[in-house]
Every structure is written in C-alpha cells, then in structure tokens.
Amino acid sequence: MDIIQKSIFNSGPHSRGIYEPPLGYFTPYNTPPYIAAYSDSGSWLADHHQHHQQQHQQHQQQMQHIRFPTPPITPPRPIAGYGYRQRTQSVIMKARGQQDELCRSPVEFPDDSKSCSSSSECGTASDFVCNWTDCDRVFDTLDALAQHVTQRHAIASLTDGLYYCRWRGCQRSERGFNARYKMLVHTRTHTKEKPHRCHLCEKSFSRAENLKIHIRSHSGEKPYKCSFEGCQKAYSNSSDRFKHTRTHSMEKPYMCKVAGCQKRYTDPSSLRKHVKTFKHSIHLIASQPLTLPSVPCLLEASSESAFTCLPAASSVESTSSSSSARYYDDSNNEPSDYSLKPKQDAEFSPSYWLGDRQHSYLHSEDFFVKMDVESPLDLRIHRI
C-alpha cells in the first residue's frame, strides 16, 4: 500500500478503519480491493490472495470432473455454498439409483439357454460330484468343484514327490505328473472344466494354448510357415504344418486297403476322410428278403455318378427271371428304379475303373443292371 493510501486510511474520516479511496483513484489496470473493516493495513491483501486461491482450486476440481465424469462414491467437499452441494448430492443419488435399478432388474436369457451367469454354473447337482478316491462331495457349481480339487487333492506324494490323479476310472492313476499344473490340466478331463473362454464366440477350452490357437481362426494369423524351399503355405498350428511338410517327401505310410485302390497318405486323418468318400462307403441294404441271389453286374445309367456294383454271390441258382430294385444316390437323395435281367452272349473282360465320379468293377458274368420303372425291392446306398 503506497504512502497516499496509508495517509488516507489513517487520517480524517477514515480513521475508523474503513478504507474509501478517492474518486478516480482506480484505473483499468488496478483491481479494487474488498471494501471492509480491517484491523491491520495489510490484512485485506492476504484475504484477497486467499480468495483467488480458492477460485483456482474450484476451477481445477471442475476440470477434473469434466475429464473424469464418473460421480464419486462420497460427496465432495462443498466449495461454493449450499447450491453447489445440493446439485452434487442430486447427481450422486441419481447415479446410485441407476446402479440399484440395474442390480434389482432380472437378467433376461434366450428361450434356449439356461438362466445362469456362466456355463460353469449350469447343470444338476449330480454333475458336480468329486469322484476322487475316498471323496464323494457334491457341489453346486463347477467352479466350486474345480476349486475343491485344486486345493484339496492337488498335493504331491510324500514318497516320490509326483502328483497322482486318483479320480475313479482314470487310466493313468499310477503314472504321476512331475508338475502340479500338469495334473490340474489333466483333471479338467474329468471335471469338464473349461476356464479359458473365447471373447469373440461362445467356445471354451481347458488349456490356454488351445484358446490361443482358436483365436487365430478369428484373426487369420498363420505363424507356422512351411520351411520347404519355394513353398509359401502357412498354418495356425504346428501339427498342421507337420502334416503338410510330409507331402514334400515320399513318405506316405498310410495306404488305402480297399481292393484296387492305390491311394496313400501321410497321416491317418486324411486316410479316414478318403475311406468315407462315396467311392468306398457304398452299402446296399435290402428292405425286403432277397428271393434271388446277388450276382456281379454293371449299372448302366445316363449319369456317370450312378456307377456302382452289386456284391457277388457264392452260387447262382436261377438266372432266367428278372428282379426289380431301387437305387438311392446320396448326391441328390432321389431314387432311381432299375431291374436285374439276364443278358445272353455278353462278353465283358474283367477290368477296373477309377475316375472322379465313378468307381466300379466289370465282370464276365452274364448279368447287368438296367434302369427301369419297377421297384418292389428297395436297396439303399448309405454313407459311413
């Protein structure tokens, strides 16, 4: 406070402690102080700084509320009086009311699903029984059963330090695991626990590695590339890459055992797929008792995919009459009628056909199959 201001403050009518500056004293560049009673000449300046500090703190708290709009659990300290406290309290009560409404509202499930929070909680009481030796405890949820097995039975043996699975009926109860996590993964085959769930679909897995491989089916990631020079193929798991690398070598130990088929494969799964094809899976099942013996024959039809062969009979008694039958093709699920009739002076040389859409034998006997409209005998062809 300058000399003029002190003199005015301490003399004349202003000696009572009320500061009233002269007219025109303040300029646009001077901020007027609070007009109040002061016991000390510098106390008004300290209160003025404190007022600005409170305004600055209030501004920071408002900016923080804008940056993080989630209302706090407890009401904040009142800053600007009763009005501000009342507004803050109303916001908190509104947020709590929404949370209570969410907690009280029942969860709706589709008609074809069970009303449980997770798949691990679905099931009856008999599904969550501990079949460990000398333990028959029943649990309400699968999570409780898994936690019981983990805490109670996953204990190392005192004799050799290995972890043994004592689940009733386990085939490797006498072969211990050298690590605790390995036994816990194994026990999931008994408890049916699948804690690793895909966040993109509804599938769950018992091992984290299987979930990691499954997620690659969503992302399209194929980190396992073929090491053969010039091959650009890649796979999502190492087992598929191993099957592929054997195609570059001549090693094909799995051979088709169907007579006349020379196909060989590098892995048993490919051989099983080959055997299940239409070429090797034709089975003729008579819906009526056979009155005539089955004879080797040739199916004459307009479609190449209709080629097949009836099984040969051990003896042929009578071949003068004809017998009708019906042929079912799995490709179109439409029946075709044909009849067995003798054909005189037929000369067929034994041979074997293997094409893309036909797989049949030709024999030298004097019978063949001709498409017809008669159908008293029902012979069906089924896939394996």
Curated annotation (Swiss-Prot):
One GO molecular-function entry: zinc ion binding
Pfam families: zf-C2H2 (PF00096), zf-C2H2_15 (PF23561)
UniProt-listed SMART domains: ZnF_C2H2
GO biological process: cellular response to nutrient; central nervous system development; negative regulation of DNA-templated transcription; negative regulation of transcription by RNA polymerase II; positive regulation of DNA-templated transcription; positive regulation of transcription by RNA polymerase II; response to starvation
GO cellular component: nuclear speck; nucleus
Compartments, record wording: Nucleus
Chain positions covered by the region annotation Disordered: 321-343
Keywords associated with the record: Developmental protein, DNA-binding, Metal-binding, Nucleus, Repeat, Repressor, Transcription, Transcription regulation, Zinc, Zinc-finger
Triggers of expression: Strongly and rapidly induced in larvae by maltose, trehalose, glucose, fructose or saccharose, but not by lactose or galactose.
Function in brief: Transcription factor which represses a set of lipase genes involved in fat catabolism.
The family this protein is said to belong to: Belongs to the GLI C2H2-type zinc-finger protein family.
Protein name: Zinc finger protein GLIS2 homolog
Source organism of this protein record: Drosophila melanogaster (Fruit fly)
